[in-house]
């Protein structure tokens, strides 16, 4: 059984037991979070208003890989190099359920 969930403005295809990295969630490590924005489950096209939920455990709160931003204007000796690391949450999907 698989589900497509939405969190942090992005969509993720998840299965039970899979580990995903999502945008930062306000949850402590080793706690369980419940995601209600389920777009579809298995092969049925269920919408947001369906009674589907996905339960996941927060494995860690960390930062992603560094992204380099480099700006340059040719012939003007203008160069700026900065970096950014986004805060992410690592989740393990425990249960995909559909309440009737």
UniProtKB/Swiss-Prot annotation:
Keywords: Ribonucleoprotein, Ribosomal protein, RNA-binding, rRNA-binding. It comes from Wolbachia pipientis wMel. InterPro entries: bL21-like (IPR028909), bL21-like_sf (IPR036164), Ribosomal_bL21 (IPR001787), Ribosomal_bL21_CS (IPR018258). NCBIfam families: L21. GO terms for cellular component: cytoplasm; ribonucleoprotein complex; ribosome. One of its GO terms (molecular function) is rRNA binding. Belongs to the bacterial ribosomal protein bL21 family. This protein binds to 23S rRNA in the presence of protein L20. HAMAP family: Ribosomal_bL21. GO terms for biological process: translation. Coiled coil: none annotated. Part of the 50S ribosomal subunit. Contacts protein L20. PANTHER family: 50S RIBOSOMAL PROTEIN L21 (PTHR21349), LARGE RIBOSOMAL SUBUNIT PROTEIN BL21M (PTHR21349:SF0). This is Large ribosomal subunit protein bL21.
């Amino acid at each position: 059984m698989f589900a497509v969930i939405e969190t942090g403005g992005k969509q993720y295809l998840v299965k039970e037991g899979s580990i995903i990295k999502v945008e930062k969630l306000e949850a402590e490590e080793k706690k369980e979070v419940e995601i209600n924005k389920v777009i579809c489950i298995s092969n049925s096209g269920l919408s947001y208003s369906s009674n589907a939920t996905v339960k996941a455990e927060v494995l860690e709160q960390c930062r992603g890989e560094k992204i380099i931003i480099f700006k340059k204007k040719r012939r003007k000796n203008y160069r700026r190099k900065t970096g950014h690391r986004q805060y992410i949450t690592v989740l393990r999907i425990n249960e995909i359920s559909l309440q009737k």
